[in-house]
Amino acid sequence: SLTEQERAAQEAQRRKEAEARARELEERRRERALTARYPDKAAHDVERAAAIQLVDDVTATAEKRLVELTQQRKAFDVEMEFYKKDPSKAPMSLRRKIAENEESIAEQQRFIAGQDQEKRRVHQRFDVELAQLRKLWEAQRMPLPGATPASDAAAPAATR
């Protein structure tokens, strides 16, 4: 008969082992899902290209907006030429438009920088996945130790 402490220790050990088994099963499930989604490098490359294209499309839209804002700013600068000697005499509405334009330009630049970071994160995620997939693909190609190929196992049975 075990003491209360010993029973608690055994139960804790059993829980720990069960959690480890559950983690291992979850990891295997994730690996199977990954290899099912990406059966080869070409499939992985297609998915990477699609993810990068999404980021590039969003970036292109932001860059187009930045060009529009820059052109708008040039028009404001032409208007400001009339107040070159004393910019403080420029109408408040013009100064407000210039300030809003500058803020919009800065916002677009921050957004584009964020998209560049997102693109790096996407590449990094796919690089990590690819490293893991290479190991999994290699493991799929190599027979498990102790396992005999089906053709070898079937041959002796046919000769009996």
Task: State the predicted function of each range.
Residues 1-15, 127, 133-160:
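Compositionally biased, proline/threonine/alanine/serine-rich low-complexity intrinsically disordered stretches
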Residues 36-135, 139-142, 146:
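Surface-exposed, polar/charged faces of alpha-helical domains
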Residues 1-46:
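Short, cationic interaction patches enriched in Lys/Arg with P/S/T/G and frequent prolines
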